[in-house]
Amino acid sequence: QQVEAFKPLMTLGCSNGSEAYTIASVLKGSRPGLKFTINAFDIDRKMIEKGAGASYRREEIYNNRVITDSFIRKTFDMEKDTFTIKKGIRSHLKFDYADALDNRLKETVGPCDVVFAQNFIFHMKRDAARRALNNICALLNPRAALFVDGIDIDIRRRLTKRHNLAPLTYKIEEIHNEARMARA
């Protein structure tokens, strides 16, 4: 029997690892035999350490209104107020340092087919955001997928055009409305 494998995925600006662990949990739950790795990068060494530690307090978990009890049971081992990512999920992640503003980003982290760069670029000034997104786009293999959020719409539009990216419109209105409701 052939084992299905997925090329490494990448999260930039991984913070405490919650997005990367969520992706791993969903992949593992929907494709149990799938072999995959998620490389999670951040510039804050404390956040990298926190993510690699895979342990969260109850408040961190229940601070998110869209998280379900089913997801929590599948993803965490729970002991009192400590929620630890299950070993079978944790084993799919590698945490390390990388800076999206570094022009050698591709040399540091390598090319990728799936990149998540969400909710960190909006902290940057326009020129830095443009440079970061250019560096991120340089990571993309042909036909790669880039998930980006939290960036100025004009910068995103210009760089999407410059890098010949095709915006995904599948269920875009539904996704947008659900995200707005979750933030409310």
For the regions a protein language model found, what residue spans apply to each?
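Extended basic-aromatic, gly/pro-enriched interface segments that bind polyanionic ligands
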Residues: 36-110, 114-116, 120
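Class I S-adenosyl-L-methionine
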Residues: 155-184
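Conserved beta-strand signature within the Rossmann-like core of class I S-adenosyl-L-methionine
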Residues: 142-151
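Class I SAM-dependent methyltransferase core
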Residues: 11-13, 40
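Conserved AdoMet
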Residues: 1-10
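Conserved glycine-rich SAM-binding loop
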Residues: 15-17
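A short glycine-rich, Lys/Arg-flanked "PGG" loop and its adjoining helix->strand segment in the class I
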Residues: 130-142
